[in-house]
Amino acid sequence: MTGKPAYKRVLLKASGEALMGSQGFGIDVSVADRIANDIKQARALGVEVGVVIGGGNIFRGVAVASKGGDRVTGDHMGMLATVINSLALRTSLHKIGVDSVVLSAIAMPEICESFSQRQATAYMDEGKVVIFAGGTGNPFFTTDSAAALRAAEIEADALLKGTQVDGIYSADPKKDPGATRFDQLTHKEVLDRGLAVMDTAAVALARENNIPIIVYSIHENGGLADILQGKGRCTIVSDN
């Protein structure tokens, strides 16, 4: 890989569902290993990488609320699911020699370090992949919002959203074969059209901090490196 990367520091957001692979629940280790290899390729380009992973493959807090339970407790359970996923990705990274660390928004010192903005940026300056677990540490906020928040805190050049499809569409392309795919949008267009890429709080936070959002398929081998070199198929959300 000789192409010059377009970004020096990025925040990668991956859904928990991506880790399931073809399974209906949990973690497919082969998928975690493939994502780890994509991150290794990004590091080989000299790009500093932070990661936020959702927890939907294990638990969703809204599932508790939808059945009459306590949303706060449900969200706390979801935060713990993100820690499990983060530890799985760290394991996959370590297997291939990529130095990484998990920083949790919820203190659990026997398992991983607690998040601080200063420590996170210090680790990234050292070349470590930093995996941010525990969401924002607060209920009622999605891991998309956590990704936008961490991207702002580490001064990321871009927020990359690895999804099930190769960009943003006017409708779900799996349900609507006539859905239109966008190459480029502004943050305002995403918000005004209500396009399903990230929740509105995440898009608004990225917009306020002038962070472009790049949506691509996380299932393409080497896709992350291609995106970083400006070669991949994606949708870019930017006001510039």
UniProtKB/Swiss-Prot annotation:
The UniProt record lists the keyword Repeat: no
GO terms for biological process, alphabetical: 'de novo' CTP biosynthetic process; UDP biosynthetic process
Keywords: Allosteric enzyme, ATP-binding, Cytoplasm, Kinase, Nucleotide-binding, Pyrimidine biosynthesis, Transferase
Domain of life: Bacteria
GO molecular function, one term: UMP kinase activity
Binding-site residues, UMP: G55, D75, T136, G137, N138, P139, F140, F141, T142, T143
Main localization category: cytoplasm
Binding site for ATP: K13, A14, S15, G16, G56, R60, T163, Q164, Y169, D172
Places the protein is found: Cytoplasm
EC number(s) reported in the record: 2.7.4.22
GO CC annotations, alphabetized: cytosol
Pathway recorded for this protein: Pyrimidine metabolism; CTP biosynthesis via de novo pathway; UDP from UMP (UMPK route): step 1/1
UniProt-annotated stretches for the region Involved in allosteric activation by GTP: 21-26
Pfam family, one: AA_kinase
The keyword Glycosyltransferase is assigned to this record: no
Summary of activators and inhibitors of this protein: Allosterically activated by GTP. Inhibited by UTP.
Reactions performed catalytically: UMP + ATP = UDP + ADP
NCBIfam families given in the database record: pyrH_bact
Family of this protein: Belongs to the UMP kinase family.
Oligomer and partners: Homohexamer.
Role: Catalyzes the reversible phosphorylation of UMP to UDP.
Name of the protein in its database record: Uridylate kinase
